Amino acid sequence: MGTRRRKRKKEIAGLPSYLVLLVLLLVWLFQELRPGPSAQEPPLEAGEVQVYFMPQDGERAKARLLALMGGAQESLYGAFYEFRDLEIAKGLLEAKARGVRVELYGESDYRKDFRRYLVAASLGQTQEPPRVPQAALRERVRPTSIDCEEIAGIPVCFDEREGFMHHKFLVVDQKAVWTGSTNMTWNAFARNNENSLLLPSPTLAQGYAQEFRALFGGQKEGLGEPVAFRLEDPLVEGTAYFSPKGGKAAREALLEVVRQAQKEVLVAAFVLTDRELVEALVEAQRRGVAVKVLLETRNLRDSREEDLLQAGVPVRQDGNPYTLHHKVLVVDGERVVTGSYNFSARAWQVNNENLLVLQSPALAERYRKEVLRLWEEGKPL
């Protein structure tokens, strides 16, 4: 008569199967819920944050930008929407002549301007606007691919997309970033209401450099990876977002800043057509937040100022006979939103843009004073 063997539940390393499953579940939860690299607090970096408001700071701002170019030792990566300034063109060419790696990425609508200004500067011209002989253009512009060419020795690529390549940033030696609303044009520095920031953060600069390299290398929508950074003078904690690849994250960050407002939201905007942003501003007004919106006069027809006015939100058109080109929100005297990112659907869906969300009472106070100054100069609707 054979011995009957008792069936036993499967065990691993002496553990019952249900305990094994429990251990595996806990390991999976740990992997899923633990903070990833993006959630880690970025290092606090030394360096002075500098902010410039045009036109009053225009000469100082351009001098600082040219000094950055003049002090560059390794690389200058510039993503520029418009390019019409001989001094800036000269600064880039001089850096190139010193052996600095200079690369530019531009909006294809302004390809002729990139050619004209870089070639004119290479010829030693200083008078605006430059006059460049066609023979010089033929001699000093060399196509290298469908989207790229070498202009006066500087490699320049263009986006060639439906959306705008709307950036206005320069990465210096992958150690600092110059960015904001200011195009590389004489008008932007001398006439328009603009803002530019110099952020000496290697962490941020490397993130911008990666976005630039992707664009320059043919990834037309960019990487879209947000970059968190911290600077100590004054203390700034911020995140940079890039669209269109990271456009949804950029827009959600923008909306969340408004939704979290408790006391005050100040807006200075070239255009305001994003319906959800308008709704968030209206909702802020309804819950007792003091909202003020200043808009560029020529874009009033395209903006949604009527929705704001009907909800009781004070709205003014700007008083500058040239252009109010800001894309700025100041919230509760503590947070600033700025960058190249217009408050429109195209900014997060189609265009190449960068958006900065900054936590800094000191920086917010400077932006707040500027927006309120422009508000006083504006005209009520």
Region locations from a protein language model:
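Charge-patterned, long linear interaction tracts outside catalytic cores
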Residues: 373-381
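HKD-type phospholipase D/PLD-like phosphodiesterase module
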Residues: 32-73, 82-260, 275, 287-335, ...
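N-terminal Lys/Arg-rich, disordered targeting/topogenic segments
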Residues: 1-13
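Hydrophobic membrane-insertion alpha-helices, especially the h-region
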Residues: 17-31
